[in-house]
Amino acid sequence: MSVRVTSLSSEVSLYTERYSDCKKLVWSWTSDASGSYAEKTTLEGQDYTIVGVIELISIIPDQTSPPTNGYNVEISTDSGIDVLRGYGSNMPNNDTMVFYNINMPVLSPLTLTVSGAGNTTKGSVEVYYR
């Protein structure tokens, strides 16, 4: 089963897929002129609540338009909890970072915030949850 989740922004491709009991949420982002990006999980204009336990997060810089070295990534719940617990700071622009054993229960829409990435750079973030 696959559920496509898309926001109204043309700068994001956000979708979920289901593999057995594991689900995958993917954000493909492009930063604005200030090097920032922010997007909440939405479906047809409504907040899309993630229900489950986050197990793994991958932060992947684009190969052709990579972000500035040392950019920051935060994934937060509606109550402001940083799912990455601050580990999304100072990301390398030439390597995928994978965070295992997150084990954070979530019952909230999630917001991806990228900062310090440089003008119109790209990347993606994958969140695996059960």
Predicted regions located by residue number:
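Surface-exposed, low-hydrophobicity beta-strand/loop segments enriched in small/polar/acidic residues
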Residues: 2-130
